[in-house]
């Protein structure tokens, strides 16, 4: 009798734990963050194609899209462009680009975006005209509020000297941020040295006009928008009734996938003190930008990893990054076909590499694990909505 009673208690405990697990999964906030890096966006593009393919297989749905699974998708520079591609609706209110269309986009348009050199010593390397043209063609008149999920795209206003973050959830307080997606995408990609800054205005319903003078979002997030995306997700969890059980900064109920565009094992380029001693201001400016981007990426990953580990939620965070780029693959504007093919190979090879030295799990296996969580959560939410 005692054995039977103990068995029943055990069953109740298992059911309670299972119910709690599913409830936790259902209310988990899912976040996708994509780094900047110019043409190196091909690397996360390759990873996204794999992830979306896994979701389609698991849900037996060829029309499944990443925006169906992530509560927040954020990006800066080329990552902001990818964010727009997979969240901007087409005429059927579905993402205008599937993940398997990202890499072909770079192959088709990259050589033109990074080919219209101004030829000026003083001024940006490229005029940005083709970039704006293709953004207007692809994104049309779509504005932030129409995005299919919450977005977080960063830029920096050189007139106000403040970062500008474009999100859906902030429009009630700041309606002037409901800009056209092509203006936002050009702004977040307008890297100093490479493209001209972007000026545009928005008009609110009460007739107010707001002016923007924007440059690359990497100035605000230093290339890695993961912390920004996580901050937006935290605010979403606090304000959206669907996540009422989530406490502030409860990373146990956060699922974060952060995609890098690759870096060298130390920095994009390495130097010696003897070399640097001969540099002038311009050479230092270029080197500092490269060093800052690389160092910031490492520190952001270190900080997020530490926080998730402290909350015993390390499996809820995955940083996918290639840290051993060499040669032309380190360049953000080498859009030659040969280099783009190399970048595809980098992404495909990365999938087979271990996530860390201490873990035998490969990125491919980790992404499949994430895909399973995303798929199960979507099904749980769909079941709840049907009641």
From Swiss-Prot:
Signal sequence range: 1-23
Biological process according to GO: defense response; lipid catabolic process
Domain of life of the native organism: Eukaryota
Major location category of this protein: other
Catalytic machinery residues: 77, 216
Keywords: Coiled coil, Glycoprotein, Hydrolase, Lipid degradation, Lipid metabolism, Plant defense, Signal, Storage protein, Vacuole
Coiled-coil stretches: 322-385
UniProt motif (DGA/G) ranges: 216-218
PROSITE patterns: PNPLA
Residue ranges of the motif GXSXG: 75-79
Domain observations: The nitrogen atoms of the two glycine residues in the GGXR motif define the oxyanion hole, and stabilize the oxyanion that forms during the nucleophilic attack by the catalytic serine during substrate cleavage.
UniProt family annotation: Belongs to the patatin family.
Cited function: Probable lipolytic acyl hydrolase (LAH), an activity which is thought to be involved in the response of tubers to pathogens.
Additional comment: Patatin have a dual role as a somatic storage protein and as an enzyme involved in host resistance.
Protein name stated in the entry: Patatin group J-1
Annotated source species: Solanum tuberosum (Potato)
